[in-house]
A protein has these predicted regions:
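A conserved helix-loop-strand patch within extracytoplasmic ligand-binding domains
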Residues: 66, 75-78, 96-99, 103-160, ...
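Short helix-initiation/N-cap motifs at beta->coil->alpha
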Residues: 70-81, 134-135, 172-187, 220
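Ligand-binding clefts/hinges and TM-proximal coupling segments of bilobed small-molecule sensing domains
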Residues: 8-14, 67, 137, 150-173, ...
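A ligand-binding cleft/hinge motif common to bilobed small-molecule-binding domains
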Residues: 77, 94-106, 160-161, 186-220
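Extended ligand-binding regions for polar small-molecule ligands
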Residues: 54-64, 125-130, 144-154, 224-263
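Periplasmic-binding protein-like
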Residues: 34, 116-124, 197, 201, ...
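Extracytoplasmic small-molecule ligand-binding "clamshell" domains
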Residues: 25-95
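Secretory targeting signatures
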Residues: 1-20
Length: 263
């Protein structure tokens, strides 16, 4: 199918393509926030977006009979605000729709049925002595650490709720991008980074042995695709049908195997 990839690192509103939210528009403008592998990432050599969410966006655009336009946002918080304001037709960026975070987000946007179950992870440098039990990292283990997290995420919300208020010599700092988080961690500015498990595994795998996962935080989150509140463009039924059909016909399992290495 045809895909228009707006340059990574740039924000381009839907006015660049006309009224993309119109039912007569040939475009489905999907906002995302890279890098967040294996859900969404970008190949700077060939200018191609790729990942689990990108593949699903392609399926959804095809089902709607539209050309997919991927619009990358440098700031995850701005992406969430813009989908709520109708600047993009849909947001596909590993967005948590469950729990307290999801309840707040549902005030300004609407979600598809869940398409992925997720937990969090604590990433540290390979020389760190922090190790969590199989039952997961506890807030008590994290309270004394300097932790970096991406602003506007469910990771930050968890840390604010369970760790920040009980800090004993530690700190929680939000940064705009995942790249800046990784740089701050590897440079020794922070002792740990909290991020969703899937991206944590990808980041560690590509770190050349400099990073490791100290343990998981079992938050039992559900991801959903977000649209403007109330679904004014009436695309949620199609999105939900794509999710349901992909699970029934084996497409979902194939995508999980491709991007996560398992069934």
């Amino acid at each position: 199918m045809a895909i228009i990839a707006l340059a990574a690192g740039l924000y381009v509103g839907k006015t660049a393509l006309g009224s993309s939210s119109s039912s007569s528009s040939p475009y489905l403008v999907v906002g995302t926030n890279i890098p967040f592998p294996p859900f969404e990432d970008y190949n700077y050599t060939n200018g191609v977006y790729f990942g689990f969410d990108i593949n699903f966006s392609m399926l959804i655009a095809s089902a709607l009979g539209k050309t997919l336009v991927i619009d990358n946002y440098a700031d995850f918080s701005v992406l969430l605000a813009d989908v709520g304001a109708g600047v993009v037709d849909m947001a596909a960026s590993a967005i948590t729709e469950s729990g307290a975070v999801g309840a707040l987000r549902n005030n300004s946007m609407s979600f598809s049925i869940p398409y992925y179950d997720a937990n969090q992870a604590i990433v540290v440098t390979s020389g760190s002595g922090l190790t969590c039990a199989q039952t997961g990292c506890t807030a008590a283990q994290l309270e004394a650490l300097s932790i970096v997290v991406q602003t506007g995420t469910s990771s930050q919300s968890w840390l604010q709720q369970y760790v920040e208020s009980n800090e004993t010599g530690g700190s929680v700092t939000g940064l705009t991008t995942v790249d800046s988080e990784i740089l701050a961690l590897t440079s020794g500015e922070f002792q740990a980074m909290m991020i969703d498990l899937g991206p944590a595994q990808s980041i560690v795998a590509s770190s050349g042995g400099t990073l490791k996962i100290a343990g998981e935080v079992f938050t039992n989150e559900l991801y959903g695709f977000a649209v403007p509140h109330g679904d004014p463009n009436h695309i949620l039924p199609t999105i939900n049908n794509v999710i349901t059909q992909s699970e029934a016909n084996g497409t979902y399992a194939k995508l999980v195997k491709e991007w996560f290495g398992g069934a």
